[in-house]
């Protein structure tokens, strides 16, 4: 008996009309735009929640080095769990239903390692003489952190946000498997209906979102490095 996936692939390759523009036009506002909005919502909320957790943990890890190894160990384990397995674990927890909530929890878990590492790396990149100069001016440790260290570390932190955002946008497509919504819904619906237009539309738009987010955050990262711009000019 032939494999259904192989038969579907053969049908796709033999079908000259991979993109049904009429379907896209008819379903643009009803299906495609809400899917894009849902994907942006999942990604934005996940990055925001992850930042709220990662920034203080990263600062704590930079200040107290004994904290850093166990933090990276735990977040590294979370990062290494396959996405479908993590989704399955989350929805098996009592009180956690399928939908956007477990998807956001999983996406936050995946981005913590990247954000914490970059926060620590950014704070480590601040020259010690700069901190000594700030302390000599009478600034407290809290003032040094918020007025000196974090502003100088911001480009490295934004680089971590950039990597985490692109990662989240990609993994969020799989969240549709547990009714998380987003562009993954188009992809999974297209697979179930054997309708290539939905699959391609979801995949192309998810890729476009990742590229746009990457370029915007790259521009922000370069803007926050005025010394690098000065060297280029």
Residue ranges and their predicted role:
Residues 221-233:
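Short cytosolic juxtamembrane segments of multi-pass membrane proteins
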Residues 57-90, 107, 117-121:
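Cytoplasmic-entry segments and transmembrane alpha-helices of multi-pass inner-membrane transporters
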Residues 52-57, 102-105, 109-131, 154, ...:
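Membrane-embedded alpha-helices of multi-pass transport/permease systems
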